Design a protein with these regions (language model features):
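ATP-dependent adenylation/nucleotidyltransferase module used to activate substrates
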Residues: 1-124, 145-158
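Acidic-enriched catalytic cores of C-N bond-cleaving enzymes acting on peptides and small amides
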Residues: 203
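Cys/His-rich short segments
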Residues: 208-213
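Catalytic subdomain that performs nucleotidyl-dependent activation
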Residues: 86, 105-187, 192
Length: 213
């Protein structure tokens, strides 16, 4: 998300658009505050307005309070975070929500949906999600084709304050297992992630060419 913010700030030198950053505190004790601090620091340095939201204020509870009622904490976290981001963007009058999803995130999500047989979610993948409801703000993913390692390398080379720690709940998720599998195989077979992404893009192209009726 921090790299996305820096990239969009740079694009303002060439394109005329307003930019507002949004942070969401899910309520994970001992973890989330580091990310919030990094968001505040980067927004101040870039002179970008930062709107801070939290599960506690917007939804009435912290993720720590409710995660035990779900198979994975990622389930409620994703739902409520997306809802808060969309509501905030709608209230701000934004035309787009730009997220920090990178190549690794995308192929993990793709394989998760494939493993679950949830082919309906395929339409939600890709660098841009079109309007599907008047109150849902379209999403863009500027880093869609950028590997996670390159994002980390950029931050180190440019001395950017980012939060690299893994979420303490992530190890319980299917995503964590798939991420580990992909990273292990990338070490053995370099380029496997890019190959999966290329296959993924072909599937999306094929799917879009199929008549709906």
């Amino acid at each position: 998300s921090v790299l996305t913010l820096h990239a969009l700030k740079n694009y303002q030198n060439y394109l005329d658009f307003d930019l507002v950053a949004v942070s969401v505190d899910e309520g994970i004790e001992g973890y989330r505050q580091h990310g919030i601090d990094a968001a505040i620091d980067n927004a101040e340095k870039l002179d970008v307005k930062l709107v801070q939201k939290s599960f506690k204020i917007e939804e009435g509870f912290a993720l720590d309070d409710i995660y035990s009622g779900f198979k994975s904490a990622c389930i409620p976290c994703g739902v409520f975070r997306r809802n808060i981001l969309n509501k905030t963007a709608y209230d701000l009058g934004a035309d787009k929500i730009a997220t920090g999803h990178n190549l690794d995130d995308e192929i993990q999500s793709f394989l998760m949906s494939f493993a679950r047989g949830d082919l309906i979610k395929f339409s939600k993948f890709g660098p841009e999600l079109d309007v599907i409801h008047p109150k849902l703000i379209p999403r863009i993913k500027p880093l869609w084709n950028t590997p996670e390692k390159e994002v980390g390398t950029w931050a180190i080379l440019n001395d950017i304050n980012i939060h690299l720690d893994e979420c303490p709940y992530s190890h319980l998720s299917l995503r964590a297992k798939i991420k580990e599998f992909l990273n292990n195989n990338e070490d053995i077979y370099p380029g496997i992630k890019n190959n999966i992404m290329e296959s993924f893009q072909k599937i999306l192209t094929f799917e879009s060419d199929i008549p709906s009726n």
